[in-house]
Regions:
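ATP-binding glycine-rich loop module of kinase domains
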Residues: 43-75
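The N-lobe alphaC helix and its flanking beta3-alphaC-beta4 segment of protein kinase-like domains
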Residues: 67-91, 97
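Catalytic-loop of the protein kinase fold
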Residues: 166-183
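Activation segment/activation loop of eukaryotic-type protein kinase catalytic domains
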Residues: 183-219, 223-227
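Activation segment signature within eukaryotic-like protein kinase domains
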Residues: 154-155
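Conserved short submotifs of the Hanks-type protein kinase catalytic core
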Residues: 119-134
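Short beta-strand micro-motifs within the conserved protein kinase catalytic domain, predominantly
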Residues: 95-122
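Juxta-kinase regulatory segment immediately upstream of eukaryotic protein kinase catalytic domains
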Residues: 1-23, 27-30
């Protein structure tokens, strides 16, 4: 993500007029997971009515990705928000609901998180649809229910989703079973786009160490000593390509 794209995304977040109320539960029992750059908590949201009708808008559960306060994590969060906005809606990609600056919740006492340390710096909040579990969790707890037809259906859905991403010049960069969510009817949804790469990025990625998870990482990412970013003349590392996702998908399956 270039500096201009980063500034544009930050301005979009701060200038949004989403008319959405959010309740964020930072208690440990509501923690859904965590990663290198963020923690995910259960939340609830509803959007304000845009007309004068008396229809009641109910609260809906959501997953709130609370990005760590350090610069690297905030940049990864902005990159994920940018990627999800750019890709748009897809049946097998987690749905982006909104992106907020946590300062907005602090400034509005009616929306303030119920648990919040006063010395904790504000974070970027990525509000996503809430799904029951990850593929990893389901396979561990329902071993007898995961038969070959179900696994083949998941494989087809994942392959079609990766193909769709690649047709739009997007490399997910961190495909693994923990980043695959399941709906109530056991359809898959790919999540965690914080490592995403775009083939036409204005600022190519040259750091292989920050891409992917070691157990699912393509072997060429471990052989980088013969390549110098200084000699690349603005080009991305040759290993950072669509083949990364193909290898990771093969490991997952």
């Amino acid at each position: 993500m270039s500096l201009e794209e980063r500034k544009s995304e930050e301005q979009r977040i701060r200038a949004h007029n989403d008319k959405m109320s959010l309740r964020l539960f930072l208690n440990k029992p509501f923690k859904l997971g965590e990663g290198r750059n963020s923690e995910v908590y259960l939340g609830a949201y509803h959007r304000e009515r845009v007309d004068n009708s008396d229809a009641f808008v109910d609260w809906q559960l959501c997953a709130v990705k609370r990005v760590q306060a350090d610069q690297e994590s905030q940049l990864a969060g902005l990159q994920e928000a940018f990627a999800l906005r750019r890709l748009g809606s897809h049946p097998h990609i987690v749905r982006l609901i909104s992106v907020l600056d946590e300062m907005e919740l602090r400034d509005d006492t009616s929306k303030a998180p119920p648990v919040h340390a006063s010395d904790d710096p504000p974070r970027l909040l990525i509000v996503l649809e809430h799904l029951p579990c990850t593929l990893a969790d389901y396979v561990r707890s329902h071993t007898s229910d995961v038969d070959l037809p179900l696994w083949l259906d998941w494989a087809r859905q994942l392959a079609e989703t990766v193909e769709w991403l690649h047709s739009r010049g997007c490399v997910h960069g961190d495909i693994k079973k923990e980043n695959v969510l399941l709906t109530h009817n056991l359809s898959i949804k790919l999540c965690d786009f914080s490592s995403v790469l775009f083939s036409n990025a204005s600022v190519p990625v040259t750091d292989c160490y920050s891409v992917g998870t070691p157990a699912f990482r393509a072997p060429e990412l471990f052989h980088i000593w013969s390549w110098s970013p200084d000699e690349a003349q603005g080009q991305a590392h040759p290993a950072l390509s669509f083949t990364l996702d193909i290898f990771s998908l093969g490991v997952l399956l």
